[in-house]
Amino acid sequence: MASTEGANNMPKQVEVRMHDSHLSSEEPKHRNLGMRMCDKLGKNLLLSLTVFGVILGAVCGGLLRLAAPIHPDVVMLIAFPGDILMRMLKMLILPLIISSLITGLSGLDAKASGRLGTRAMVYYMSTTIIAAVLGVILVLAIHPGNPKLKKQLGPGKKNDEVSSLDAFLDLIRNLFPENLVQACFQQIQTVTKKVLVAPPSEEANTTKAVISLLNETMNEAPEETKIVIKKGLEFKDGMNVLGLIGFFIAFGIAMGKMGEQAKLMVEFFNILNEIVMKLVIMIMWYSPLGIACLICGKIIAIKDLEVVARQLGMYMITVIVGLIIHGGIFLPLIYFVVTRKNPFSFFAGIFQAWITALGTASSAGTLPVTFRCLEDNLGIDKRVTRFVLPVGATINMDGTALYEAVAAIFIAQMNGVILDGGQIVTVSLTATLASIGAASIPSAGLVTMLLILTAVGLPTEDISLLVAVDWLLDRMRTSVNVVGDSFGAGIVYHLSKSELDTIDSQHRMHEDIEMTKTQSVYDDTKNHRESNSNQCVYAAHNSVVIDECKVTLAANGKSADCSVEEEPWKREK
């Protein structure tokens, strides 16, 4: 017994055979620094090319500005590859949003998707409010606006005032599109028109009255006529992203509740998502050239760059400093506090998405690249990214909120208007709410700025004075928006990881049960066939209804082979 126990306690030896491909040679410890740099560049070739494209575009644009005036056709040809890149990225937005939302939500139950959405919304609202407050603090501290600056820039263009109520109602209307196909390329907007209304005429001849009214209108409106503002709804060009997201969120949740019945549909959208991501990879290899051409063409097209830099330099510095503080300090700090992980290694994983946003100035256009960075580089669960990122690209606009808060108070300072505490709070809240609905409003930047200025009673015509530097600030705030979306996905994934693991274990348990049932049915069928293999069923003309058997005839002792395909039996002679 002792010897047996000793034998049992002996360590078991396991032989592991490895192929040569599994073995890697140990790198020498003392390697040339240049060789190590080349290795890193080779592993991150696409990222290196993208960064090189941004630098090349900026340098070439600056050098070409020093040359003789360039013909507009030449500028158009320089920017043409960038225009193609933007078209390709925007082409993938619709199928990517549809497939990602449906596949992400179909893998979650109703409770999990609700908690996921709640965490995402809390993060979005918190960071957007922080960004708006930060912008207000910086613009009040730096005070870039000066009444003398207004005289240098000259008068702006008159803009129609926009009602906050109309904008809010348009937001709700676009959330529930009446035609899903139309929502792919149009969205609804309230339009105000000024109409001259004549007083009731006592003349019997209506035609003469109308002609008289038209003649008076051509010259000068008489005192009796009144100007009446009439409102109406019109469809404007532009994808109704908010409406599409709302519908497909509901579609994905409903499909997830159907379980096995919707399995085929889930597989279809999973395949669609994989196809779109394959196309994204192909487009990303073209992006370095496209981004370089975009930046180069935009720099060349700017008029009076030096004059604009002198006049609006402090305004630009205020916005850029705010974006750097928010994107480089506040967002990483929030991520570290919640997850206790290194935010800079996280940022390294999304650097490709950040540089793409900097070049394209489009959160939605960068969405395919952001998906790839988070899922492939950082290993975030696809159920989180496919739900959080499309929603975040639509409503989470930290950079936009900061920019609009700074711009509104800058215009007030430029006009010599001193805002009280209530008006400053109004600017902060309006900037937050306007940035949330920016994606579903046509001409979003202009309209949302009009909302803020109208809310605090500032002149709306001064917005046109800021357009000269918007090309740069737009890229900066878009890159911060993408960084905010990415950190949000990482935070939501960290908070939801235990729930996702529980759902995975439930799915595995369900699959094991289904596999056991299938195996049981298979075993029963096999046993049934084996029990019937020794039996022969005689019918007319010696036909049988079994697969195959070999029997001995009692009449003459000869054997016979029988099968379903062969009847009557072939008797052996």
UniProtKB/Swiss-Prot annotation:
Keywords: Amino-acid transport, Cell membrane, Chloride, Glycoprotein, Lipoprotein, Membrane, Metal-binding, Palmitate, Phosphoprotein, Potassium, Sodium, Symport, Transmembrane, Transmembrane helix, Transport. The chain crosses the membrane at residues 45-64, 88-108, 121-142, 235-258, 268-295, 317-338, 384-410, 471-492. InterPro entries: DAACS (IPR050746), Na-dicarboxylate_symporter (IPR001991), Na-dicarboxylate_symporter_CS (IPR018107), Na:dicarbo_symporter_sf (IPR036458). Residues 1-44 are cytoplasmic. The modification Phosphotyrosine is found at residue 538. One of its GO terms (cellular component) is axon. Residues 344-374, 424-457 dip into the membrane without crossing it. Na(+) 2 binds at residue 394. Residues 1-11 have a biased composition (Polar residues). A lipid is attached at residue 38 (S-palmitoyl cysteine). It is found in: Cell membrane. Residues 1-29 are annotated as: Disordered. Signal peptide: none annotated. One of its GO terms (molecular function) is high-affinity L-glutamate transmembrane transporter activity. Coiled coil: none annotated. Glycans are attached at residues 205, 215. Glycosylated. Palmitoylation at Cys-38 is not required for correct subcellular localization, but is important for glutamate uptake activity. Na(+) 1 binds at residues 392, 396, 481, 485. L-aspartate binds at residues 361-363, 400, 441-445, 474, 481. Localized in brain and is highly enriched in the Purkinje cell layer in cerebellum. The modification Phosphoserine is found at residues 3, 21, 24-25, 505, 520, 531, 533, 543, 559, 563. Belongs to the dicarboxylate/amino acid:cation symporter (DAACS) (TC 2.A.23) family. SLC1A2 subfamily. Contains eight transmembrane regions plus two helical hairpins that dip into the membrane. These helical hairpin structures play an important role in the transport process. The first enters the membrane from the cytoplasmic side, the second one from the extracellular side. During the transport cycle, the regions involved in amino acid transport, and especially the helical hairpins, move vertically by about 15-18 Angstroms, alternating between exposure to the aqueous phase and reinsertion in the lipid bilayer. In contrast, the regions involved in trimerization do not move. This is Excitatory amino acid transporter 2.
